[in-house]
């Protein structure tokens, strides 16, 4: 079993607060609307959106080797636009990973947009290839889809 981590940054032309709300806090609702070819649905399994909340995202893409992801919110800072979440079920847990956490931080930039900083930490099970490049691509796609939606809908998530 090997441990690993990676960091990734995505620049977007939407304010940090709007991106944080749409891409993190409400992704289980927004994702299926804006990327239905990837996300079939989402829901809050337990909790109210604060620390300890568990959310489920159902995957609708045969290229992904799992059909859903359940994540627990471990840290939420509405003022600094930060979220840390832990994979608790699905998403390759037990098949690809022993454990995985992801930390997102949305930092305002001088152009009115923001820089999304992501750090993932994980333990890969023996014999499983590290696919961090695919994970980074997925994060970029997630943020760019959210950005496109928010630019097209300027009153959403204000």
From Swiss-Prot:
Coiled coil: none annotated. Keywords: Cytoplasm, Pathogenesis-related protein, Plant defense. One of its GO terms (molecular function) is signaling receptor activity. Gene3D superfamilies: 3.30.530.20. This is Pathogenesis-related protein 1. It comes from Asparagus officinalis (Garden asparagus). Induction: By wounding and elicitor treatments. Its main location: cytoplasm. Belongs to the BetVI family. It is found in: Cytoplasm. The keyword Calcium does not apply. GO terms for biological process: abscisic acid-activated signaling pathway; defense response. Signal peptide: none annotated. Pfam families: Bet_v_1. The lineage of its organism: Eukaryota, Viridiplantae, Streptophyta, Embryophyta, Tracheophyta. SUPFAM superfamilies: Bet v1-like. One of its GO terms (cellular component) is cytoplasm. It comes from the Eukaryota.
């Amino acid at each position: 079993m090997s441990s690993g981590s990676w960091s990734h940054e995505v620049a977007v032309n939407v304010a940090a607060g709007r991106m944080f709300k749409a891409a993190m806090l409400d992704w289980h609702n927004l994702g299926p609307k804006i990327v239905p070819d990837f996300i079939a649905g989402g829901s809050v399994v337990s909790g109210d959106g604060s620390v300890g909340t568990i959310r489920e995202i159902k995957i609708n893409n045969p290229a992904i080797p799992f059909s859903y992801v359940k994540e627990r919110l471990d840290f939420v800072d509405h003022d600094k636009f930060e979220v840390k979440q832990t994979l608790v079920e699905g998403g390759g847990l037990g098949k690809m990973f022993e454990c995985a956490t992801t930390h997102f931080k949305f930092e305002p930039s001088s152009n009115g947009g923001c820089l999304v900083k992501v750090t993932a930490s994980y333990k890969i099970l023996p014999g499983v290839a590290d696919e961090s490049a695919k994970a980074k691509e997925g994060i970029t796609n997630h943020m760019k889809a959210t950005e496109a939606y928010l630019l097209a809908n300027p009153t959403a998530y204000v």
